[in-house]
Amino acid sequence: YLVVDFNPETIADLNKLKIPAIYGDVEDDALIKSLPLDKIKMAISTIPDFETNKFIVETIKRVNPKAIVILRAHTIEDALNLYKKKADYVLTPYFLGGEYLANMLSEEKTDEHGYKKEKEKHIKMLFERLKKGQEHPDVEKN
């Protein structure tokens, strides 16, 4: 696998972990043409922009219809439109958050001790992201 990201700090962090990652803009034709799209098994985009994800799914499916393409959408309409473009799965974070909480409740975590482990894990993750300068995961393009 290969991670493509527009944030140089993310690339540096991934490379330190020996995760193959390159800096780039997925809408850059030269970058896309340099990737072995005909050989990939799966592509995952966490970018919330509809047009970018539409470009990703259309480009990959044109070259490799069997590749699994997982994308992210902000709205129900965007998710449904990405499915029309042949996305295999579309993440909708707002709804996933609700599902996650429902699962926590169904696991009978009805007292403060049931949430202690989740809370500690979450606080650790938040501090790690804050230490990296991430207040919110949005990355603006120049």
Task: List the predicted regions and their residue ranges.
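Cytosolic regulatory regions of ion transport systems
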Residues: 1-142
